[in-house]
Swiss-Prot record:
Residues 134-145, 156-177, 518-530, 596-613 have a biased composition (Low complexity). Keywords: Meiosis, Phosphoprotein. Residues 232-241 have a biased composition (Basic and acidic residues). It comes from the Eukaryota. Residues 49-67, 633-647 have a biased composition (Basic residues). This is Meiotically up-regulated protein C8C9.04. Residues 29-46, 92-103, 146-155, 193-215, 390-406, 413-432, 488-508, 561-589 have a biased composition (Polar residues). GO terms for cellular component: cell division site; cell periphery; plasma membrane. The modification Phosphoserine is found at residues 162, 165, 197, 200, 396, 489-490, 515, 519, 523. It comes from Schizosaccharomyces pombe (strain 972 / ATCC 24843). The modification Phosphothreonine is found at residues 168, 491. The keyword rRNA processing does not apply. One of its GO terms (biological process) is meiotic cell cycle.
Length: 647
């Protein structure tokens, strides 16, 4: 890292230009300020001082009267002489032309502090206060002006001791721009650093007024003057060490690199490494940062190597790795885990170490199954540890879990499909797909999904078996069957199971048809507005049907020997008993059903036209009619998106 001498020269020139401009500005500002201060302070301060002196004189006169009356016996001629000196001194102060010191108005019982003038030296110093103690030779009574000038004790070698005078007029006018610029660029020195200089001996004056030149400027001037440095001298020591400093910096960087390399080598060469203290040094080449963060007391490593100086730091391989996997850790979320990473790097870097790769591989086999796409779901079903060669058990557990968590009737099938779409498992063959019971018409969305030889067929067929599992599990509770059967019908499909409950549902519909038709003439005293011809009025058809009534009626039908899972079409009964004096469960014709519009709820809106038309392919009509039609479009969209994925 070398420095161009041209750049150094250019920098010097720029600094010279800047300092000269600053010097000119400070020259003009300081001269203007000094003139203004001299003009204003001579006029205003003398007026203020005269007013304040008059007040003080009145107070002191009253004070003298009190003192003379109280302590007339103890008064001595020395004290009277001191009082006379004080009065004479006040007049002298007011007559001095360049005096800018404010006389502070004090209480009657306060002791006067000595007033220090601003001494001017040959260098034009403005002497600031450095400590609060009054000088040694000043007494309680303020001496005269001559006594005050001589009371500033200065060492013999002081440059200002020979030329100290009582006149302070030349103080501000002798401000040199060199000193101002030097003060501007010089580091701020505090009063302790000024301890040995001749400027630090005088005592602190009383409070200064606003009309006086700023005490900060005077203080800075004094600091700069105590160690005089001109502007030209100031630049050169700053610019001189640039080139050697650059070389030193580069040397420091190289030394730091060498030391860091030596430290790393020493850390790797240690015989055994504890997991908490130095796990980063050993495990850095094997595990990623996520795993390193989760390393705690669960990982214990012993380092295997032939000669520590011959093996680079990244090639050291721990031969025993014990990993405790939690569900929240990144290992359980399919990132491969510690052992998978260890296997990969061991295969790459263990060629020089005999036996190391076999040990790592063995550890992988023992601790975790090989990470596959199923690792995501293993964390959810931790009570059933699943290997990759057991897809049947895994599939059934996922379907069972997803189905058991569904409690809402209306959203059951859709949420089950969501849970199962993300599950990668074995694709069943064509023979494994259960055949739909309700006919083979193209309108049935599940039938299309089953016959399509893609993974979409697998997902929806699993959904079908889900419904059958729910039916067979709750075989004894007919109300639960009713809820399960309504779940697929609300999304536009039927449970296509080869088991008996769905067939019994089909047969029960044929068995229920004559009972409903027989109940119509057997109740002549009906209170409902029955239309001749076995049809309901439009008001009844449009009336909302409560879900509890459907459940009660299906319970009644199940009690009479049928195992129905489909709600009665168009039923508006409030009491399920056939032949009662309440509203008859008369089937609704297709005309009135469509005239009723969308005010009918889901079970009645999905009903078929009449009871006579309720044949085997009535299921297809039920699935596509009424409210279930938009749900079918959802299945079509799902099929379309999955077809894009898998083809």
């Amino acid at each position: 890292m070398t420095t161009n001498p041209d750049i150094v020269k250019q920098t010097k020139n720029e600094i010279h230009q800047v300092t000269s401009r600053v010097q000119e500005k400070l020259d003009s500002k300081s001269t203007n300020a000094v003139e203004q201060n001299n003009n204003s302070s001579q006029a205003s301060v003398t007026k203020d001082n005269k007013k304040k002196a008059a007040k003080r004189a009145k107070k002191k006169a009253a004070k003298k009267k009190k003192q003379s009356a109280a302590a007339s016996a103890s008064s001595t001629p020395v004290e009277e002489a001191q009082h006379a000196q004080e009065e004479q001194q006040e007049q002298t102060i007011l007559q001095e032309p360049g005096f800018t010191q404010t006389i502070v108005e004090k209480d009657a019982d306060q002791v006067d502090e000595p007033l220090e003038p601003i001494a001017s030296s040959a260098l034009g110093t403005v002497e600031p206060p450095t400590d609060n103690k009054p000088s040694a030779s000043t007494s309680t009574a303020v001496p005269t002006t001559e006594a005050r000038n001589t009371s500033i004790t200065e060492p013999a070698n002081s440059p200002s001791s020979s030329s100290s005078s009582a006149s302070t007029k030349s103080t501000a006018t002798t401000q040199s721009a060199d000193y101002v610029v030097a003060e501007h660029f010089a580091p701020q020195r505090n009063d302790e650093q000024l301890g040995n200089s001749p400027a630090s001996i005088t005592s602190k004056p009383a409070t200064t007024s606003a009309a006086q030149p700023s005490s900060k400027v005077e203080e800075n001037m004094a600091k700069a003057t105590s160690q005089p440095i001109t502007t030209a001298e100031k630049e050169i020591p700053e610019l001189k060490p640039i080139e050697p400093e650059a070389i030193m910096i580069s040397k420091e960087i190289n030394t730091t690199h060498d030391q860091a390399a030596a430290t790393t080598t020493a850390a790797v060469a240690s015989a055994s490494t504890t997991a908490t203290a130095e796990s980063h040094a050993v495990a850095d080449g094997i595990m990623n940062d996520n795993v390193l963060e989760s390393i705690g007391e669960n990982v214990q490593q012993e380092t295997v190597f032939e000669d520590a100086s011959d093996i680079p730091h990244a090639d050291v391989i721990p031969h025993t790795t014990t990993v405790t996997v939690e569900e929240e850790s990144p290992i359980a979320l399919g990132q491969g885990g510690v052992t998978h990473e260890a296997t990969t790097s061991a295969r790459a870097s263990a060629s020089g170490i005999p036996g190391a790769f076999e040990e790592v591989q063995q550890t992988v086999q023992e601790d975790l199954p090989h990470p596959t796409a199923e690792t995501v779901e293993i964390a959810r079903f931790a009570e059933q540890p699943v290997r990759a060669q057991q897809p049947e058990q895994y599939e059934s557990s996922v379907v069972q879990e997803a189905t058991e968590t569904v409690t809402d009737v209306g959203k059951g099938v859709s949420s089950t499909v969501k849970n199962e779409v993300n599950v990668p498992s074995t694709i069943p063959t064509e023979s494994e797909n259960p055949v739909a019971v309700g006919g083979t018409t193209a309108e049935h969305p599940v039938q299309e999904a089953v016959t399509a030889p893609t993974e979409t067929a697998h997902d929806f067929s699993k959904e079908t078996t889900t419904a059958s599992k729910r039916v067979s599990k709750h075989d004894k509770a007919s109300a639960e069957k009713h809820k399960v059967a309504r779940k697929p019908s609300s999304t536009g499909q039927e449970p296509t199971t080869p088991s008996t409950p769905a067939k019994s549902a089909q047969s029960s519909k044929h068995a229920r048809r004559p009972s409903k038709q027989a109940s119509a003439p057997s109740s002549p005293g009906t209170t409902s507005a029955a239309v001749p011809g076995g049809k309901k009025s439009a008001i009844e058809a449009a009336a909302p049907i409560p879900t509890s009534a459907d459940t009660v009626e299906s319970k009644h039908a199940a009690g009479s020997g049928s195992a129905t899972t489909i709600p009665s079409p168009g039923s508006a009964t409030t009491k399920p008993t056939p032949g009662s004096a309440t509203t008859k469960p008369t089937p609704v014709s297709a005309t009135e059903e469509h005239a009723a519009g969308t005010t009918k709820p889901a079970p009645a809106a999905g009903a078929t036209a009449t009871a006579e038309n309720e044949t085997a392919d009535g299921k297809a009509q039920t699935a596509t009619d009424g409210e279930a039609a938009p749900k079918k479009s959802w299945f079509k969209r799902m099929k379309k998106s999955f077809g894009k994925l898998f083809h």
